[in-house]
């Protein structure tokens, strides 16, 4: 019997990796938190949930059911606070392993608000899916529905008022022909970018840089995010010529940590043609090529 023990131990050691894999493959997958966009709800993300469950079985995925549909027009700082209260317990349960944030459209700005204002967040990877990170300036069906008497060139007259800033879309309306007014009036995007003196800027930058990775996804056929390069932190100059991320003041001055993240190789950018705005979270090719590998 004594001689058989080493052989049994050897067999056990050989089988142990297989046993661990069989017990719980999900141990290697971090929780995923999904934040929806304007006029969306958790019901819009059934395909995305299916893709994640098929590729990473057992992953804890939470699609937050807050500020749905018309409620998504609430001011963005109010939404940031609401989502923060819902997300914080998930982060705490994840502990040192951390979580991933997958945030679509307007939700990408809400997630930036979370990342910059939470000193103890444990977000590993932030996936910004067709989100107007540098703002919005363009006529879209959404705008015509919300403000039928206003078009691109005139919307600043409403958005850059105290009343206008009570609408989420006005919180990131960035008119390049009225930049000075935007900087002074914007309640959300301008302070988030530290485009004007912000007392919390140093802390917000430190919080943002807790991220390990940021993935930026967008494309030229989006049809809603205008310019579409805003999803990559590009934006118009005063002549409506798009300047890419590295030529933006927020990058060059590293106002909230964008350049620092880029310098450490922590930003990945995907430009995907042929995808309209409402299909980013339902397109399996986008998931396979741009999202799946980051959810480990």
UniProtKB/Swiss-Prot annotation:
One of its GO terms (molecular function) is fatty acyl-CoA hydrolase activity. Keywords: Disulfide bond, Glycoprotein, Hydrolase, Lysosome, Signal. It is found in: Lysosome. It is an enzyme of class 3 (hydrolase). Residues 1-28 form the signal peptide. It catalyses: hexadecanoyl-CoA + H2O = hexadecanoate + CoA + H(+); S-hexadecanoyl-N-acetylcysteamine + H2O = N-acetylcysteamine + hexadecanoate + H(+). Glycans are attached at residues 53, 60, 184, 200, 239, 283. It comes from the Eukaryota. The active site is at residues 105, 222, 277. PANTHER family: LYSOSOMAL THIOESTERASE PPT2 (PTHR11247:SF27), PALMITOYL-PROTEIN THIOESTERASE/DOLICHYLDIPHOSPHATASE 1 (PTHR11247). Catalyzes the cleavage of thioester bonds from S-palmitoyl-CoA or S-palmitoyl-N-acetylcysteamine (unbranched structures) but does not have activity against palmitoylcysteine or palmitoylated proteins, branched structures or bulky head groups. Conversely, hydrolyzes both long and short chain fatty acyl-CoA substrate. This is Lysosomal thioesterase PPT2-A. It comes from Xenopus laevis (African clawed frog). The lineage of its organism: Eukaryota, Metazoa, Chordata, Craniata, Vertebrata.
């Amino acid at each position: 019997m004594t001689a058989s023990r080493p052989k049994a131990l050897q067999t056990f050691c050989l089988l142990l990796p297989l046993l661990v894999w069989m017990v719980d493959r999900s141990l290697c997958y971090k929780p995923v938190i999904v934040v929806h966009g304007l006029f969306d709800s958790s019901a819009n993300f059934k395909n995305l949930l299916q893709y994640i469950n098929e590729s990473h079985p057992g992953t804890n995925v939470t699609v937050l059911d807050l500020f749905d549909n018309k409620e998504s027009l609430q001011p963005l700082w109010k939404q940031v606070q609401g989502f923060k209260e819902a997300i914080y317990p998930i982060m705490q349960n994840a502990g040192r392993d951390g979580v991933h944030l997958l945030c679509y459209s307007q939700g990408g700005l809400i997630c930036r608000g979370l990342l910059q204002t939470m000193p103890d967040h444990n977000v590993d990877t932030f996936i910004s899916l067709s989100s107007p990170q540098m703002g919005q300036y363009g006529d879209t069906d959404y705008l015509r529905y919300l403000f039928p008497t206003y078009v691109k060139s005139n919307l600043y007259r409403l958005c850059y008022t105290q009343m206008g800033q009570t609408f989420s879309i006005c919180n990131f309306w960035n008119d390049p022909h009225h930049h000075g007014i935007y900087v002074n009036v914007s309640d959300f995007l301008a302070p988030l970018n530290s485009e004007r003196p912000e007392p919390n800027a140093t802390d917000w930058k430190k919080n943002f840089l807790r991220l390990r990775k940021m993935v930026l996804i967008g494309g030229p056929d989006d049809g809603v995010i205008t310019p579409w390069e805003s999803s990559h932190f590009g934006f118009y100059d005063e002549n409506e010529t798009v300047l890419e991320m590295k030529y933006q003041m927020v990058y060059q001055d590293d106002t909230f940590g964008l350049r620092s993240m880029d310098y450490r190789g922590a930003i990945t950018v995907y430009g995907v043609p042929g995808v309209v705005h409402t299909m980013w979270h339902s397109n399996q090719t986008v998931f396979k090529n741009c999202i799946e590998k980051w959810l480990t």
